[in-house]
Amino acid sequence: EKVDQQRKEKEKLERLTQTSENYQKNAIVIRSRALQGFVDNIKTRQESLEELAALGIDLEAACYRVAVFDLDLYSDGSQLTAEKRQESALMSFVLFNISDEIISKEKAGVAYQAGNNKVGALFMGNRTREFEQKIMEICRMIQDKLKELMSLDISIGVGSWARTQQELQ
């Protein structure tokens, strides 16, 4: 009976762990969709800000700047096999995690999964030369870390400064 009880406890712990992992994955997807909606002006500014605030994300800033990171390995436009699509999604998730970690640590904005296995970054701050340099430095850090960990290259596109959500590109 004691062995049976231990087995049940172990199964319960495994279910809780799986539930927690599923929740984390879903939270990232929900967060990314909300950020993508803000960047793409899908909802009004107020709707986006309220949705993001409910997720614990504050986007109030003097200026914004968007960057997109694209894995070079998968961006040549050729048809991807199911296996390559899965690999691409996994590498994109690694890129997202690296980006999210660095951008959060630098307190420069937020990262999100932008679809098509791309990762977006919404940089928030004051339009200064120092912040401009910090953004470029962060992009290089992400590029270098991905190269170091996965031996992968990325292309980076950085948009222009925007004072409002409508100006984001």
Say what each PLM segment does.
Residues M141, I156-R163, Q169:
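Cyclic nucleotide signaling catalytic output domains
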Residues K2-E137, A162-T164:
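Interdomain helical linkers/hinges and coiled-coil/dimerization scaffolds
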Residues V110-N116, D144-I156:
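Catalytic core regions of nucleotide second-messenger enzymes
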